[in-house]
């Protein structure tokens, strides 16, 4: 009941609470790349646990080595900014222009994004739905909106000057 509708599918049915990703659908509806349904409160809790190196409310959830593995560049594909399940800052990162080099994040097809900045202890969560009511309504600038919102969060925390000259931004 707390999940918003995703989109109207090709059968003219409103999808709500089910993964709408075609690849996940072909894999039985559940896959590691799509279909996270959550709230900002739950994502903030999870993000704080990741920021704490795997601990939340004095309970260890993940080993520090696991968090480090999840959030370090995998380099499976040379030059990739991908971690195991996350992305890291590079080029035009969805986390905006002020995230530190010690950050990791993830985006979703519907325009959602989550970035966790370990250096600055900042978490920015954006839950949106750029494909509602139909994915054809998805604006090509939705990615830019996410960048602007993440950047505005850093500006509001007076972190703009601290991070505006990081090396990876030279290609921005």
Where do the language-model regions lie?
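Short, surface-exposed loop or secondary-structure junction motifs
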Residues: 1-101
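Glycine-centered small-residue hotspots that permit tight backbone geometry or close packing
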Residues: 17, 108-111
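Short, gly/Ser/Thr-rich active-site loops of penicillin-recognizing serine hydrolases
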Residues: 52-56, 65-66, 71-74, 134-172
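Short intrinsically disordered coil segments
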Residues: 100-104, 143-144
């Amino acid at each position: 009941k707390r999940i918003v509708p995703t989109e109207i599918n090709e059968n003219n049915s409103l999808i709500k609470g089910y993964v709408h990703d075609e690849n996940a659908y072909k894999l039985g509806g559940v896959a590691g790349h799509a279909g996270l349904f959550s709230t900002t409160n739950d994502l903030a809790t999870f993000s704080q646990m990741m920021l704490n190196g795997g601990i939340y409310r004095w309970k260890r959830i993940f080993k520090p080595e696991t968090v480090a593995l999840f959030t370090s560049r995998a380099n499976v594909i040379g030059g990739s900014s991908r971690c195991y399940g996350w992305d890291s800052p590079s080029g035009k990162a969805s986390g905006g222009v002020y995230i530190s080099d010690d950050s990791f994040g993830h985006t979703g097809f519907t325009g959602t994004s989550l970035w966790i900045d370990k250096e600055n202890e900042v978490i920015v969560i954006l839950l949106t739905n750029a494909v509602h009511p139909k994915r054809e309504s998805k604006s090509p600038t939705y990615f830019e909106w996410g960048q602007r919102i993440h950047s505005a969060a850093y500006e509001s925390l007076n972190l703009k000057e601290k991070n505006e000259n990081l090396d990876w931004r030279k290609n921005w």
